[in-house]
A protein has these predicted regions:
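ASCE RecA-like P-loop NTPase motor cores
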Residues: 1-257
Length: 257
């Protein structure tokens, strides 16, 4: 690969069409660059398939590289369905890790990159930790979860859900592959354990969990106010008949967003 081509690759981001020989050379160039600069790089691929293929090839040839892939929503712009909760969970984890510079290379299909992404400030504002022995007001905790986009349900089964039963809170954090059961003693977190969604039985103890926002947009009071203002500017007519306007005004997301 010519020197001029290598310099072009080391710009902040570039388009890439995958094949194995290119993957080997590009990985070598990136590895050398990252060792010296210690700054993550963005690669934009033509489609999701190229992103997945490139990730697999780079991991095979350069296992020491930390590679992040931001998944696509896998929905069309005007679909009346929302992305699958597990997919949203993967995206939010990837976005959070990008804000923390946890990876050497970020892979983004161009279809994914063309969508609006939440700013770093949003991810940081709505992410928080909980740990054993921490004092927490349960009602305030419930309010915060709802403002973060989590659904209050009877039984936790999917990412983005939580349930409260007396002094026990079950929650499936976005970005986590397992749900957690938080047991309180008064206002103090006594224990935190993972649990099985099928049997609902507790499994393994842990000392700390990370909670990411449940959505890529805010539905707290400030977010709802901004939505209402912008909606009134863009659309005319009787807003009382607008389902999106009414639902978001109540802080309730609807299918398709």
């Amino acid at each position: 690969m010519a020197t001029s081509q290598k310099k072009n690759l080391l710009k902040k981001g570039f388009m890439f069409e995958t094949n194995t020989s290119q993957s080997i050379e590009i990985g070598r160039v990136f590895y050398s660059h990252l060792k010296n600069k210690k700054k993550s790089l963005n690669i934009f691929t033509a489609n999701v398939f190229d992103a997945i293929s490139l990730k697999e090839e780079l991991i095979w040839f350069y296992p020491e590289l930390r590679i992040n892939h931001l998944p696509d929503w896998e929905t069309l712009p005007y679909d009346q369905i929302s992305p699958h909760p597990e997919l949203t969970s993967e995206r939010l984890l990837a976005l959070y890790q990008m804000t923390q510079n946890e990876f050497d290379i970020n892979l983004l299909p161009i279809t994914t990159a063309l969508h609006f992404l939440p700013p770093k400030s949003y991810i940081e504002k709505f992410s928080f930790d909980f740990k054993v022995k921490q004092e927490v007001d349960i009602e305030a905790f419930k309010t915060r979860l709802i403002e973060n986009g989590y659904f209050n349900v009877d039984k936790v089964l999917s990412p983005g859900e939580f349930a409260i039963r007396g002094s026990i809170i079950d929650i499936y954090p976005m970005g986590s592959i397992v749900p957690y059961r938080i047991d309180f003693f008064g206002n103090e977190i006594d224990t935190i354990r993972t649990f099985d969604v099928d049997t609902q039985r507790g499994l393994y103890p842990t000392n700390k969990i990370k909670l990411l926002p449940a959505r890529e947009f805010p539905i707290d009071s400030d977010g709802v106010s901004q939505f209402r203002e912008n909606y009134r500017e863009k659309f005319n007519g009787d807003l009382s008949k607008s389902k999106p306007y009414k639902n978001i005004s109540k802080g309730t997301p609807f299918a398709g967003i």
